[in-house]
Design a protein with these regions (language model features):
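Gly/Ser/Thr-rich phosphate-binding loop
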Residues: 155-157, 161, 224-225, 249-254, ...
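ANL superfamily adenylate-forming
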Residues: 20, 108-157, 165, 171-188, ...
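ANL superfamily AMP-binding
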Residues: 13, 28-53, 83-85, 89, ...
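Conserved AMP-binding/adenylate-forming
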Residues: 20-23, 39-86, 416
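AMP-binding/adenylate-forming catalytic core of the ANL superfamily
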Residues: 62, 83, 100, 242, ...
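Short hydrophobic alpha-helices that are characteristic scaffold elements of the AMP-binding
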Residues: 67-72, 94, 212, 223-224
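AMP-dependent adenylate-forming
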Residues: 2-26, 127
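Conserved AMP-binding/adenylation subdomain of ANL enzymes
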Residues: 177-207, 211-251, 265
Length: 511
């Protein structure tokens, strides 16, 4: 569906509701605001295929800006507002953005960027500052009607950089004239939304940062379907539960670290909320420990739907709760793309053997890494298969199990160790809030297993807790997979989507 169609069909129906401020944008307003943004972009000379960058917190004008770029045929790059100015500068320049849109909330970063972003037109929401125009004032006088050359744009999002510098994932823009004719919608997204039952009656809760691929794509999908998006300004366990009850949420999307935090909420508080409207809880972004998912299904019921995909969107697997209970630990079977498990020589491996996970097949999406031909080539095999860098295996029914990322593998005394199993065990210990496991140098063995733990109570960090956790590991998994030593940190460096910046921890031990 198209924002113009929805805007005419139900102009007064809420499209976006901010859970904290309770600000509302209706479908009619979403259509008009995005048209005004599109006219602004054209007035500044932007043509289909040009790029803009958006660095915003979870702001109520986020989606009017996204749809303005989309219906202008532009590439839009959403950037984490938690990045350092130098990191934002790199992405804005690399994506070749002609416009940067940010907010007063990020004024200090914006001021730093103003010094280094020559030739980029800069706008600010909720005010202005040196070098930035007010976006609201710039669009206020623009027409609310459709631009003459309306056509479909798309995102160029950057990988989170958990193993190196972020790279833009670039696909050919559709530039399909709008509004859509029947059958012209993105077939991959349409299929996913159909499976989840997205429609005009859907009320979708979005608790994660909107700049990330999953919240961005699911929100735009549910809005295009005529639904309502409930946006949490930031994730809070009780606010999320309260929002499900208050707005009668039907669909939601999470990451495993949110589940871990949910499960640490006192049971007496959990049971205060009516979650009966909740039909579909989607999760991805990082592997979910089996014990965590078991407890979430026990609590919420068999409404959890997991998928495995990346910003590259070169393939996707899906699994519902019933399938998962029969294949615990799996991330599903391919929805599109075909799965291949390959050894280091690119040869197919049999069922049950661990190797690199690759997507291929005619229905897999083709992509390239913007301005990085070498990285694009390294992600592809001679057969044309592409990988997200994960390691795993297939069972006899074709279900995929992820073992870990290839770059995280520890080689100790010639034995390959994947730290995910150790992490999944440690995170379930009642005194552990978060954990990272990786290899550190060992003169005799090459590498040894190291854990860095974020304790629930920082005052307990020390030799006694270290000994307790190491003993706990050795009681439940083999000693070779158990950490030789454990260090403690107040907080681990996680991306807001739940991905762990393990290299930031690991690099300290390899210098």
């Amino acid at each position: 569906m198209h924002p113009g169609v929805n805007g005419k069909k139900f102009p007064d129906k809420p499209a976006v509701i901010m859970a904290g401020s309770e600000k509302v944008i209706t479908h009619g307003e979403l259509n008009e605001l995005s048209n005004q943004g599109a006219h602004l972009f054209r007035s500044l000379g932007l043509k289909p295929g040009d790029s803009i960058a958006i660095m915003l917190e979870n702001h109520f004008l986020f989606f009017p800006i996204i749809f303005a770029a989309w219906r202008s045929g532009l590439r839009y790059t959403t950037i984490s507002w938690r990045l350092q100015p130098s990191e934002v500068e790199y992405i804005v320049k690399d994506c070749e953005a002609k416009i940067l849109i940010t907010s007063k909330f990020l004024e200090e970063t914006a001021k730093d960027l103003n010094k280094v972003l020559d030739g980029v037109h800069k706008f600010m929401l909720d005010g202005d500052t040196d070098g930035y125009e007010s976006y609201e004032q710039a669009t206020e006088g623009m027409s609310k009607d459709v631009i003459e050359d309306e056509c479909q744009g798309g995102s160029m999002l950057y990988s989170s950089g958990t193993t190196g510098k972020p790279k833009g994932v670039k696909r050919e823009l559709p530039l399909t004239p709008l509004p859509y004719k029947a059958g012209e919608e993105d077939p991959g997204l349409a299929r996913v939304l159909l499976l989840y039952g997205a429609g005009e009656e859907s009320i979708y809760l979005s608790p994660a940062p909107l700049y990330h691929a999953a919240p961005l794509n699911f929100n735009t999908g549910f809005l295009a379907a005529g639904g309502t998006s409930i946006i949490l300004e930031k994730f809070d366990e009780e606010k999320a539960l309260e929002s499900i009850e208050k707005y009668k949420v039907t669909h939601s999307q999470w990451v495993p670290t949110m589940f871990v935090r949910f499960l640490k909420v006192d049971p007496s508080i959990r049971t205060q909320y009516d979650l009966s409207s909740h039909q579909v809880a989607i999760h991805a972004a990082a592997p979910c420990p089996v014990a965590v998912k078991e407890q979430m299904i026990d609590w919420w019921g068999p409404i959890l739907h997991e998928y495995y995909a990346g910003t590259e969107y070169n393939g996707i697997t899906m699994i519902n709760s019933q399938e998962w209970l029969e294949h615990k630990g799996s991330v599903g079977r391919p929805l599109f793309g075909t799965l291949h498990i390959l050894d280091d020589d690119g040869e197919e491996l049999p069922v049950g053997e661990v190797g690199g996970v690759y997507f291929g097949g005619e229905t897999a999406t083709t992509f390239e890494y913007h301005n990085d031909e070498e990285k694009t080539k390294s992600a592809m095999t001679e057969q044309g298969y592409s990988s997200l860098g994960d390691v795993g295996y297939l069972d006899e029914d074709g279900f995929l199990y992820l073992t870990d990322r290839k770059s995280f593998m520890i080689i100790s005394g010639g034995v390959n160790i994947y730290p995910k199993e150790t992490e999944d065990l440690l995170v379930m210990h009642p005194k552990v809030a978060d954990v990272a496991v990786f290899g550190v140098p060992n003169e005799e063995m090459g590498e040894e297993v190291k854990a860095v733990v974020q304790p629930v109570d920082l005052s307990e960090a020390g030799p006694a807790l270290e000994a307790e956790l190491i003993a706990y590991c050795k009681e439940n998994i083999s000693s070779i997979k158990s950490p030789r030593s454990i260090d403690f940190e107040e907080e681990l460096p996680r991306h807001p989507t739940g991905k762990l910046y393990k290299r930031l921890l690991k690099d300290k031990y390899w210098k």
